[in-house]
Amino acid sequence: MPLLAKRADLRHDRSYLLVASFLMAVGWLLLGPEPVAAWGPATHVALGEALLGSLYLVPPAVRAILERFPLHFLYGSVAADISFAKKYVPDGRHCHNWEIGGEILASAESDRLTAVGFGYLSHLASDTIAHNVFVPRQLLLTSTTQALGHTYWEHRMDMHVGEEFLSLARHVVMDHAHGEADELFDEVLSRTVFSFRTNRRIFRGMIRFQGHERWQRVFSQVLANSRFDLPNTLVDRYFSLTFEHMVGYLRDRADSPAAALDPIGEVNLGLAKKVRRLAMSDQAADHPEVLEEMADAFFPIPSDPLIYWPQLTDPQFTGGVTSGIPARKTVPAPTIS
C-alpha cells in the first residue's frame, strides 16, 4: 500500500477511535445508572497541585516519593475514576473502596507506582467530602421537578475551579504514557460489565469530551440558564475542606477523619434522594429557606477549624482556588503524541 494511503488509513482509524470514545463518554453521561465520578478531573488535579506545592505538610517518606514523581501522583489522583459500572463488581471490590486503594499501594513495585498509589488514595480521601456533603446537599437544595444530577454538580465545580486545571488534567492523562500504572489497575481492579481496556477507553474519552469545544458551549449555556447558584466562596470552602481530608489521610491513614467515611457516599447519596422526595411531596421545594434548613440538618458543611489549609504558602491557592491565578504545571513535557 502506498505510504500516503497508509497515513490516510491511520488518520481515519484515529478519528474513528476519537469519535467512538466521544460517543461512549456522551452515552455514559446521559444514560449511566450511577454517578460518573465525585469531584471532576479538574478539581482532583487542582487538589493534587495544591498538595505538590505544600509537601512540607506530609510525612517525609511520602514527600520524597511525590517530589520525584509528581506526574505519577497526579495520574493516580485522576485515574481512580477509570472504572465504570462500579455497582456490578463483587462485594468489597468496588474501586472506590478503601481496601482496594490500599491494595493498589501495597502492590506497587516501584517508587513511580507508589506515587500512583498515593494519588489514588488521595482521590478517595477527596471524594469523602464530595459524596458525603457536597453532592447530597446540592441534590437536596435543587429539589425541583427535574433534578440537577450528580454529574451536573461535579462538572459545575470543575467549571468554577477553572479551565487551566481541566487542561492540565488532559495533559496528564493524554500526553504521557501510563502503561505501567494501567497494568497495576488492571491487576487489582475487578472487572465491571466492561473490560479494563474498554474502561480505559471510556475514561480517556471522558477526559477528551470535557475539553471539547461543543461540550463547553453547551454546558456554558446550561449555566447561563440555571437558577441555582454556586458562589465562589462556597467553592473555595469545599476545596479547602477536601484538601484537609486529603492531607489528613496521607498523614494519619486509618486514623484520619477521611478514613471513617465512605468515599462513594452510598448512604448519604441515598438519603439525599429520599429527603428530596419528601421535600417535593410536602411542597418544601417551593421554599428555599426550608430546603436550606433540611440540608443543614442532614448534610451539614463541616465547621471545624482547618489545620492544614491555613499553612499553605503557595499564592496560587492562598486566595482560594477560584482566585484566578493561572495554574502552575508541575509535570514534564509530553512523552507521547
Q: What kind of region is each of these model predictions?
A:
Residues 119-120:
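Alpha-helical transmembrane segments of multi-pass membrane proteins, especially transporters
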